[in-house]
């Protein structure tokens, strides 16, 4: 059983991009930035509990941080884990919640 504290720490933020928007429109898939140590089961449980929707599948990937330079200094951005969460048919998740 996953604790409620852990559920709140798994999802960091929704990932908004052109590719994520197209996936949401075509395949009913939502993209989240998640904790690097989060498992697929934890991500599924967190989405189902927080947004009250049914999850069909979860695919994850780790996006490696880019190397950036500022003058002679060189640094590296942090790695980010993303989760593509596919919702079951008839399920909908709306972050904006505009007027209808």
From Swiss-Prot:
Keyword Ribonucleoprotein applies: yes
SUPFAM superfamilies: Ribosomal proteins S24e, L23 and L15e
Any GO molecular function: structural constituent of ribosome
PROSITE patterns associated with the record: RIBOSOMAL_L23
GO biological process, one term: translation
Stretches of the chain forming a coiled coil according to its record: none
UniProt-listed Pfam families: Ribosomal_L23
InterPro entries, per the entry: Nucleotide-bd_a/b_plait_sf (IPR012677), Ribosomal_uL23-like (IPR013025), Ribosomal_uL23/eL15/eS24_sf (IPR012678), Ribosomal_uL23_CS (IPR001014)
One Gene Ontology cellular component: ribonucleoprotein complex
Record keywords, A-Z: Ribonucleoprotein, Ribosomal protein, RNA-binding, rRNA-binding
PANTHER family: 60S RIBOSOMAL PROTEIN L23A
Subunit annotation: Part of the 50S ribosomal subunit. Contacts protein L29, and trigger factor when it is bound to the ribosome.
Family statement: Belongs to the universal ribosomal protein uL23 family.
Function, as annotated: One of the early assembly proteins it binds 23S rRNA. One of the proteins that surrounds the polypeptide exit tunnel on the outside of the ribosome. Forms the main docking site for trigger factor binding to the ribosome.
Record's protein name: Large ribosomal subunit protein uL23
Organism: Vibrio atlanticus (strain LGP32)
Gene: rplW
């Amino acid at each position: 059983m996953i604790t409620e504290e852990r559920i709140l720490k798994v999802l960091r933020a929704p990932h908004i991009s052109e590719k994520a928007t197209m996936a949401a429109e075509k395949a009913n898939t939502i993209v989240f930035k998640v904790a690097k140590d989060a498992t697929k089961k934890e991500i599924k449980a967190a989405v189902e509990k927080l947004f009250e929707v049914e999850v069909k599948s979860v695919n994850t990937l780790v996006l490696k941080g880019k190397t950036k330079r500022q003058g002679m200094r060189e640094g590296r951005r942090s790695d980010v884990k993303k989760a593509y969460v596919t919702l079951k048919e008839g399920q909908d998740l709306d972050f904006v919640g505009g007027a209808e």
